[in-house]
């Protein structure tokens, strides 16, 4: 049975559990991350194995390779580090034609390299506007702060990707730039009027709908359309994307593991994972999280070591997994029922993958 899911996998090669799962539930595609890449030879072998799972059809393979800080393939595996969108935005301010020419050439080379590795899409370009004071989750990934500039540069990026036989992926429809929190961890709410959104953020995507691209949704509440649900799981917003913005191509959810979609259990797991990461570093972090940890553990975390905190957090994560799996099944169903053609699941966690494979869609 084919499932409408693009999956991440756990490591540099498929495990037996993954092979068994993907044999029973045929994936719509795969997405790779740094954890899946250790050498040129290994990467080629992995993409060959993934494509060989379903010889009867073409299986697309994706990777986040926008350029700048979003690059899963780095030298010496990749030929070079590619510039960020902001780099071309700055050139554009001085010389529009040069920026467009260099951006297209950049994506021709980037996509050509990905094709050599058996990868079909860089999950680019980012089409979100930049806004002062917004979360830096977009930041230098944006081509600029005006619709005209962003559309102009995105068309060059799309042309470069297509020139090398790649699949452009415009994101994050209908616009992520105004988010003041990172949707990997929290749920952004945009209260901007529909009239203003249509003249700015939404306009960008409306101008790009004829470019033969796929699109990735934003995990953001747009209160002027649906005050309750983020775009990915909102039928109102997906209908708006289809009927008002006019996008008729493949619509893919952003990663369903992102905690913006999961309410209180998402906030809890987000905090636990951030604390584990910080406790493993040399950064000063306890003051920022002492209240949250007191609520989670009912202890004064200043009195225990980082190692003890890490173990406590790992235990809480394990205890909360069943609740998270229930939430994951729910949002998977909601995203597909809302009108997303495909859902993206990136973690590579086998229990999560089994859960969403068994979701019944209306």
Task: List the predicted regions and their residue ranges.
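Extreme N-terminal starter segment of soluble prokaryotic enzymes
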Residues: 1-5
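Second-shell residues forming the walls of enzyme active-site clefts
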Residues: 7-8, 14, 35-55, 59, ...
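Short beta-strand/turn micro-motifs at beta-sheet edges
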Residues: 17-19
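Catalytic domains of carbohydrate-active enzymes, especially glycoside hydrolases
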Residues: 21-33, 117-118
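Glycine-rich anion/phosphate-binding loops
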Residues: 39-45, 92-112, 147-152, 197-198
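Glycine-rich, aromatic-flanked loop segments that form ligand/cofactor-binding clefts
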Residues: 51-81, 106-130, 150, 158-174
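A charged helix-plus-loop insertion that forms the helical arch/lid used to bind
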Residues: 77-97, 142-144
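Short glycine/serine-rich loop/turn segments
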Residues: 121-144, 172-191
């Amino acid at each position: 049975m084919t499932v409408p899911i693009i999956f991440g996998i756990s490591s540099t090669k498929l495990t037996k559990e993954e092979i068994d799962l993907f044999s029973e539930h045929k994936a719509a595609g795969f997405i790779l991350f740094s954890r899946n890449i250790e050498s040129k030879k290994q990467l080629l072998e992995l993409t060959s194995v993934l494509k060989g799972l379903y010889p009867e059809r073409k299986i697309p393979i994706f990777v986040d390779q926008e350029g700048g800080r979003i690059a899963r393939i780095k030298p010496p595996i990749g030929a070079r580090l590619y510039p960020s969108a902001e780099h071309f935005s700055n050139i554009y301010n001085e010389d529009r034609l040069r920026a467009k020419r260099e951006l297209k050439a950049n994506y021709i080379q980037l996509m050509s390299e990905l094709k050599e590795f058996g990868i079909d899409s860089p999950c680019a370009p980012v089409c979100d506007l930049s806004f002062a004071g917004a979360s830096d989750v977009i930041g230098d990934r944006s081509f600029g702060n005006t619709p005209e500039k962003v559309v102009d540069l995105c068309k060059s990026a799309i042309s470069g990707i297509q020139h090398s036989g790649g699949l452009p992926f415009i994101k994050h429809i209908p616009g992520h730039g105004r988010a003041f929190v990172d949707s990997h961890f929290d749920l952004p709410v945009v209260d901007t009027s529909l009239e203003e959104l249509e003249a700015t953020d939404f306009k960008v995507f409306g101008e790009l709908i004829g470019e033969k691209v796929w699109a990735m949704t934003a995990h953001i509440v747009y209160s002027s359309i649906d005050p309750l649900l983020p775009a990915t799981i909102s039928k109102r917003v997906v209908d708006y994307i289809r009927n008002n913005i006019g996008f008729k191509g493949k619509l893919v959810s952003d990663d369903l593991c992102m905690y913006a979609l999961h309410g209180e259990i998402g906030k809890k797991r987000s905090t636990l994972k951030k604390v584990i990461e910080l406790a493993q570093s040399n950064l000063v972090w306890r003051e920022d999280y002492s209240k949250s940890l007191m609520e989670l553990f009912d202890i004064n975390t200043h009195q225990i070591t980082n190692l003890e905190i890490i173990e406590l957090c790992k235990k809480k994560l394990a205890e909360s997994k069943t609740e998270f799996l229930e939430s994951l099944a729910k949002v998977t169903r909601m995203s597909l029922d809302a009108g997303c053609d495909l859902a993206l699941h990136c973690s590579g966690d086998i229990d999560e993958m089994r859960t969403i494979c068994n979701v019944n869609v209306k």
